[in-house]
Amino acid sequence: MKEVILIKNGELALKGLNRRTFEDMLMANIRRRLASLGKFTCTPAQSTIIVEGPEDADLDEATERLLKVFGIAGLSRAAAVEKDMDVILNTCVEYTAPLLNAASTFKVEAKRADKKFPLNSPAICREVGGKILSKFHHLKVDVHNPDVIINVEVRDKCAFIHGNQLKGAGGMPSGSAGKAALLVSGGIDSPVAGWMMAKRGVELIAIHFASPPYTLSLIHI
């Protein structure tokens, strides 16, 4: 089992032939944001980006940093395992145990991108749900408003298992919409405007005029 971070890139999936250009910008921003934590790799796959770090990587800190990167709609810490149902079942119990121990209700969601996998999505949900109920007797199933959602994604090369998805900053990757200058005053309006522009992919150059003692002399007059 290898632990990775799954990035959901949101509205980038709506882009056409230039979608890969936006994904490349987002992956470059991710690598730059995590550079001080070690060498991380980014791999685009089926509307997601798989972020892998070195064995001793601090994934808690990496997750906190990525939540502030524009272009990321959501992310999850996930266990990457081989596409074997027994391995998937055991990993679901072991990897998500901290979440399940603290919860009262749960739900299983499965996505089977690899159609050659012997079980379909509803069957995967039944198998995983049954395994969890056999190990965590205090839990109940709630498909409408669960405390924890256990996700199983069967991809082409491996399967990913993760809990609730964390909401990211959203928007577009920084630098994808050119550059602009932001006049930063002493009020709240300019920082808010800057944040909204940055969320749409604008790379900002902040400008601030510090003019004392001239402004102070005008006030005294």
Role assignments for model-derived ranges:
Residues 1-181, 191-217:
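RNA-binding accessory domains that recognize and position tRNA/RNA substrates
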Residues 187:
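Conserved G/P- and acidic residue-centered "switch" motifs that form tight phosphate/ATP-binding loops
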Residues 219-221:
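Conserved small/polar residues in nucleotide/adenosyl-binding loops
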